[in-house]
Amino acid sequence: MKINFINLQAQYQKYKNEIDEQIKEVLDSSVYIGGKVGELEQNLAKFSGAKHAIACSSGTDALLLAFMALDIKPGDEIITTPFTFIATAEMIAFLGAKPVFVDIDERTYNIDPNLIEAKITLRTKAIVPVSLFGQTADMAAINAIAQKHSLTV
């Protein structure tokens, strides 16, 4: 039996007309950087209430930019979950920092906020929760811990 990891075809079919129209506009304009990308960035910034948004080609690039914006340096520590795509730890290590893994809550598969504080050291700069399977990590608890210890989430 073959079980697909994710059914991209079903997701595509749901928005096919909208996606195809946007792709056609980009191809017709021959503007592949800027144009629609700039429009997307403006819409994302407005939607999120941020001053700026930067579109990235991958989540890996987005993580790298976020860590660089936080001025993560060699020797810094970032708390995250071990139950994530490799890019989370990879980009931490790429900058010479250390991923510090906090175990998951076995009910949600997300990082267990009750275990975070025990892993915080003087070198800890941030907490990177990862929400999985349609369940958001306990952001209220994580943000409270981060605020208490002056960490970025």
Q: Residue ranges of each PLM-predicted region?
A:
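Short beta-strand segments
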Residues: 4-7, 57, 128
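PLP-dependent aminotransferase-like
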Residues: 68-153
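Solvent-exposed, non-membrane alpha-helical residues enriched in polar/charged side chains
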Residues: 20, 24, 28, 41-45, ...
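N-terminal "arm"/small-domain region of PLP-dependent enzymes with the aminotransferase-like
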Residues: 1-29
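Phosphate-binding glycine-rich loop
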Residues: 29-77, 91-95, 101-103
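Generic alpha-helical secondary structure signal
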Residues: 14, 18-22, 35, 39, ...
